[in-house]
Design a protein with these regions (language model features):
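GST-like fold's C-terminal all-alpha helical module
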Residues: 40-133
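Residues that scaffold the ATP/ADP-binding catalytic core of kinase and kinase-like folds
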Residues: 17, 111, 140
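Short, flexible loop/turn segments with low-complexity composition
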Residues: 28-33, 138-148
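Long, amphipathic alpha-helical surface segments
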Residues: 130-135, 140, 151-154
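Phosphate/oxyanion-binding loops and surfaces in catalytic or ligand/nucleic-acid-binding neighborhoods
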Residues: 21-25, 111, 134
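A structural signal for short, well-ordered beta-strand segments and their strand-loop junctions
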Residues: 9, 28, 89-90, 141
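GST-like domain detector, emphasizing the conserved glutathione-binding G-site
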Residues: 1-73
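Acidic/histidine-enriched, glycine/proline-rich intrinsically disordered or flexible terminal extensions
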Residues: 144-158
């Protein structure tokens, strides 16, 4: 995302910018919730994303996908424990935590739906189902006709 004076190139920067622009629509964590939110987001943005990429694209990274799948799963099991101890995470209002980590969890599930379904993380699964059925998700993930250079004379049409 580019502005006149700066570029936001990290997903978390873009999310923070969006929350600052319209804070009333989102659940805002306070105190210990805010600290935990930052910790979990960093865990997903760094460790989970690292292992997710190596799980999904193991041929490109020349790695063992099962090792990285298990690393992701242990992070999800940690999140499961966090959810059990912190019911605010499952608030009906979207939060910065929710917006930041659910796309990663969704990608992980899509990589192997059967494996994901067999894992013991009920809270994570419920959270993902709520995310995918939310109005926010449906609005953002609308399907569009595939862009074609020939069809659009090489121009991008929004």
């Amino acid at each position: 995302m580019q502005f006149y004076d700066k570029v936001l190139d990290e997903s978390l920067d873009i999310i923070n910018w969006a929350f600052a622009k319209n804070p009333s629509n989102f659940y805002s964590a306070k105190g210990d919730e805010s600290k935990l939110t930052c910790e979990v987001i960093k865990l997903f943005d760094n460790d989970f994303k690292y292992h997710l990429d190596r799980y999904k694209y193991y041929q490109r990274h020349k790695t063992d996908p099962n090792l990285h799948r298990e690393k992701c799963n242990s992070i999800l099991l940690y999140l499961e424990e966090v959810i059990k101890k912190n019911d605010w995470i499952t608030s009906t209002e979207p939060s910065i935590l929710y917006i930041s980590i659910m796309p990663f969890i969704r990608q992980y599930r899509i990589a192997d739906c059967d494996y994901f379904s067999s894992m013991d993380h009920k809270g994570v699964t419920i959270l993902l189902k709520e995310f995918e059925s939310s109005a926010l998700f449906k609005e953002v993930m609308q399907k569009h006709e595939q862009w074609s250079k020939d069809k659009n004379n090489g121009a991008y049409v929004s």
